[in-house]
Amino acid sequence: MHDATLSRSTDSSQPLVPLLEERWSPRSYDETATIGDDTLDALLEAARWAPSAANMQPRRFIVGRRGSATFRTIEQQLLGFNAAWAGRASALLVALAEVESADGDVRRWAEYDLGQAVAALAVQAHAEGLHLHQMGGIDVDGVRAAFDLPARLVPVTVTAIGTVAHPSRLDEKAAARETAPRTRLPLDEIVLVRE
C-alpha cells in the first residue's frame, strides 16, 4: 500500500537500516489477515536466537492466533485502551520473563533478555511485512491464572502482531494517535555520559 499513513519512517538524526527506520507500532490491523505457520515460526525463531546473558535464555512465549481460545484468553487480559483495538490483530503474544530457574537461581537480567528477544521478533516481523504493537497494559495476575504459570515466569507484555490497516478503522482519538508524527527524546537526553 502506498498510503502515507501506512508508512511512518523515522526522522532520525543519523541514517538507520531500513528495517529499523520503518518500524512502528500501529493499532489499526486488518482483521481478515492471517499469519501462517512458517511466518509465525520465523518470528519465534528470531526471538529464540536473540542474545542472552550466559546463554540462559530466560524468555518464554504464549501465542494465540485470532479465532483460537488462546487468543481470546490473552485478549481478555488486556487493560484499558488496548482492549479496544488489539482483537483485530492476527495474533497476540505474551512475553514472559523467567526470573528464576527451576532450581531457584535468580535471573536478574531476565527482562533485559526478554526485551532483546522481542526486539529481534519485531525486526523479523517487519521483514515479513507485518507490524507489532507491544503493550504493558495487561492484567499480569490474570495472565498468570489463565495459563497456570509458576511464580518464576512473569508476564511482562502482550504483543499484537498483524497486517497494518488504514487508521479509519479506529475511533477518532485513536486514528489521530495513529497518524501523529513519531517522536523520540533527543540523544543528549538519553545518553548520560559520552566521552
Predicted segments with their positions:
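Acidic, surface-exposed loops and disordered segments
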Residues: 1-195
